[in-house]
Amino acid sequence: RGVGGALVLDGRLHSGSSGLALEVGHLTVNPEGRPCHCGGRGCLDVETDPLAFLTTARRDPGPEESLLKQAGDLLRTEYEDADVRNAAEALIDRLGLGLAGLVNILNPDRIILGGLHRDLLEADPERLRAVVADRSLWGRSGSVPILPCTLSHNSLVGAAELAWQPVLDDPLAVLT
């Protein structure tokens, strides 16, 4: 559970000075928000996770191991319900704030989202892209593509997909 991130620079995964680069889940996106297990409050981890979505949508969350599936199913099947739409919009806005901060700091050539964040992007792509564009310098001056992960497994797939893309595009080129 949680929000992960990865940065690929020149085809290599950047891990930072102590291996903890891009702990994006602990960016504050709501200073008065939910308490986080890190000791902070309003971290991306707890403000944009399936539990936050389900409770904001006024749904009773089931077992923790199925929260992601419950949230995704709810987005796909009941998005027109006012509580579901309001919850999705709140999470999209918080996710957009976090992504805008990353865009300002890193100026990435793209952002790839998996899990619930992919589902939120697919539910309302215009809203998420607008929040990132409105809140980031690079978003206003040029478009940073925000893309859904195309792989089905959610743990670090966005970063892995990006890191392996050159190999998938031209396998022989990596041998030279």
Where are these regions (language model features)?
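Phosphate-binding/catalytic loop of phosphoryl-transfer enzymes
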Residues: 1-52, 159, 167-175
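ATP-binding/phosphotransfer module of carbohydrate and carboxylate kinases, centering on a glycine-rich
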Residues: 32, 44-176
